[in-house]
From Swiss-Prot:
Keywords: ATP synthesis, ATP-binding, Cell inner membrane, Cell membrane, CF(1), Hydrogen ion transport, Ion transport, Membrane, Nucleotide-binding, Translocase, Transport. One of its GO terms (molecular function) is ATP hydrolysis activity. The keyword Chaperone does not apply. Produces ATP from ADP in the presence of a proton gradient across the membrane. The catalytic sites are hosted primarily by the beta subunits. This is ATP synthase subunit beta. It comes from Bacteroides fragilis (strain YCH46). It is a peripheral membrane protein. Belongs to the ATPase alpha/beta chains family. InterPro entries: AAA+_ATPase (IPR003593), ATP-synt_VA_C (IPR055190), ATP_synth_F1_bsu (IPR005722), ATPase_a/bsu_AS (IPR020003), ATPase_alpha/beta_chains (IPR050053), ATPase_F1/V1/A1_a/bsu_N (IPR004100), ATPase_F1/V1/A1_a/bsu_N_sf (IPR036121), ATPase_F1/V1/A1_a/bsu_nucl-bd (IPR000194). Pfam families: ATP-synt_ab (PF00006), ATP-synt_ab_N (PF02874), ATP-synt_VA_C (PF22919).
Amino acid sequence: MSQIIGHISQVIGPVVDVYFEGTESDLILPSIHDALEIKRHNGKKLIVEVQQHIGENTVRTVAMDSTDGLQRGMKVFPTGGPITMPVGEQIKGRLMNVVGDSIDGMKELNRDGAYSIHRDPPKFEDLTTVQEVLFTGIKVIDLLEPYSKGGKIGLFGGAGVGKTVLIMELINNIAKKHNGFSVFAGVGERTREGNDLLREMIESGVIRYGEAFKESMEKGHWDLSKVDYNEVEKSQATLVFGQMNEPPGARASVALSGLTVAESFRDMGAKSGARDILFFIDNIFRFTQAGSEVSALLGRMPSAVGYQPTLATEMGAMQERITSTKTGSITSVQAVYVPADDLTDPAPATTFTHLDATTVLSRKITELGIYPAVDPLESTSRILDPHIVGQEHYDVAQRVKQILQRNKELQDIISILGMEELSDADRLVVNRARRVQRFLSQPFTVAEQFTGVPGAMVAIEDTIKGFKMILDGEVDYLPEPAFLNVGTIEEAIEKGKKLLEQANK
């Protein structure tokens, strides 16, 4: 059978209807999720993805790029399969878009063995059930809501509380500490942040463009002729972007494109030994939002708060693929924008059901000047269990939560009557809780250029020791500011002694 050619019959925003001529007997319409190609007048190609079969000869598709300039009657060519992503060592250190084209201005990528972005989750017998902790070097996370290898972690927070900075620090720490490989999917976020992330990664050595390029970048140039491709393949991250300015089709699919890249690296572990892959999605809310934008145009009835009726299905299909197999693990960290700080909104609420750990960022904590602004009482982890993390770790974490909870309860009394009305025992609790609260902060490597303070990665043993000393009252004599933005307890003691000396002068 010769290849059938379609023609555009209707364009409504990002949704394109394609009509295929032919009799019923010889006409085989492209399958759902197949990619079709439209050649624009300027020679560039536009990929559209089949979403529905409507009528007898028409398919309804969603465009992966702007539909500006399309006209009725333009030819449409089926590609014979779904959108695919390139795989292998060649994609290390590279930037790609939703359809797997390179967007970093460097050489084109080879499509041999490319993976389809619509894949089935691993079979049950291929899964692994071993529980292991992934230590990040960030005190508040490692102590109170430890991440599990192969788990799903949600970063919840409103606008501007530090989700992206925390993700950048995690990428930096995992690359340095675990020699792990990271895949970053930028889903509907700011293009500027993507640019900053790439520069940050080149500076920290997570992505390598070679010394010659790095020197020219530091002088303010961006000269791709100086890129050393042998160095690029030693990079420890790949970036996939579908940013805010992209149409909703691209934003809804780019999370799947990034996940496909992460799966390809995990599956390479079958040859090279088990691999730990970190998969970052910034922001999973935009995945839902893009789905709701397209949903109405596809003629679906909206459900609660205007979201698509298939919200739970789309989310489940993606989340089920993020898992550990015998060839390696994919640990995913998903930033979740919370609309109007409302955790009961269907988008964050649907995401919650899939998560193993939640890190909730709070505006109240940013107002205290404590960064990362993680809310220790709202954040949770399924693996904070003495059988997994050890008895001492578990006990210290519970004591930290108890003292912070008691402090929260006493705040109402303090705000009305003042500290003087508290009993001596309660006053001691408040003073220690304030030290604990400040010690949960720490300087970040990726924020060093803004703060001027070198970043700290703290081992879990040092974290447990530090909080135990505060809870046991061994450092009650030190002023509260000593505990703010330090790594280990030794740094806090040194800082506290300097503050005491200055106060006594």
